[in-house]
A protein has these predicted regions:
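A hydrophobic, small-residue-rich beta->alpha segment in the mid-to-C-terminal subdomain
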Residues: 219-253
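Cysteine-nucleophile active-site neighborhood
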Residues: 82, 90-155
Length: 301
């Protein structure tokens, strides 16, 4: 296992001396954040922030938790102070009519209204879809955990800047039991695979723009290994492994790849290539989002 040490993150208002000001929205509830810290060393938002800091040294990051009952409600003009918003994954089911989901959907609608460019992974994509009028469902058959295989760009996605640098087909870290059923009106489907037909999309709504993916470009193989172990019972119940030992074998391979991304034997055994193993390639959608929607506006400010 690879527990990840907690890091320090910048909090606070905009200052022109920093590279960017990012707002990271945790999709987890307090209990879910505590559970992930126990197993992985960080909440989803802390992990996302660490990735963004590594990719953009000098960035300032504020984390918020819109699901929390005591969380301050951020109006669009407050969100507009940031250069970009990142919405994390979580175990939430966006189709459940709970106070936590309603609060997060209200936050996402405020993000759109703020016209601040936004990016989301997994549940982050699902929140953005439902907030703009689309639909999310429980997967009819859960068969995507660990690695999303052979993701392929649509005709619209081949020339879309979100997927610049991607091969004709690629694998990515993934773990989810829900999926987008219908995109909102006007959204652009950018990629899919045989398991989940909506793997990447662009959504424009209420003056705002969102790019998102169903997979997890922000996560390392070691973090995916932790997630597999946490959900071992569910994965066995779904028929993805015969028993917990089978889940452990797959998690151990991902741990090993985390430590040795150039190990050809591990790449062969997992059935992945360097686009999955190489950190920069794995994060390419995040880098493309920042380069295309964030950096030009920051320079013009």
């Amino acid at each position: 296992m690879h527990p990840i040490a907690a890091g320090a993150f910048s909090e606070g208002p905009n200052e022109r001396s920093v590279l960017y000001h990012f707002l990271v929205a945790e999709s987890e509830t307090p209990d879910e954040r505590a559970a992930r810290r126990h197993h992985a060393g960080r909440s989803a938002g802390e992990s996302y922030a660490a990735t963004l800091e590594q990719m953009n040294p000098g960035v300032a990051i504020t984390r918020v938790a819109p699901a929390d009952a005591e969380a301050a409600v951020l109006p669009p003009h407050a969100i507009a102070r940031y250069d970009a918003v990142f919405v994390t994954g979580s175990p939430l089911h966006v189709y459940d009519d709970t106070p936590e989901v309603r609060r997060q959907l209200a936050f996402m609608r405020a993000v759109y209204a703020s016209r601040t460019p936004a990016f989301g992974s997994c549940a982050g994509l699902q929140l953005a879809v439902v907030a703009a009028g689309g639909r999310v469902r429980k997967m009819p058959e859960r068969i995507e955990a660990g690695i999303a295989r052979r993701i392929t760009a649509t005709d619209a996605g081949r020339d879309h800047p979100l997927l610049a640098g991607r091969a004709a087909a690629w694998d990515a870290p993934a773990i989810h039991g829900d999926e987008v059923e219908d995109l909102p009106a006007g959204a652009i489907l950018l990629a899919g695979n045989a398991v989940t037909c909506i793997q990447a999309a662009e959504i424009r709504h209420d003056g705002g723009i969102f790019w998102g993916v169903q997979y997890h470009p922000e996560l390392s193989p070691g973090e995916i290994a932790v997630a597999l172990r946490r959900q071992a019972d569910d994965l066995v119940a779904a028929g993805l492994a015969h028993d917990a030992a089978g889940v452990e074998r797959r998690a151990a391979l991902l741990d090993a790849l985390h430590d040795a991304p150039d190990d050809r034997a591990l790449l062969w055994e997992l059935g992945v290539d360097r686009q999955f193993a190489d950190e920069a390639h794995r994060r390419i959608e995040i880098a493309n989002f920042i380069a295309t929607l964030v950096a030009p506006h920051r320079r013009a400010a």
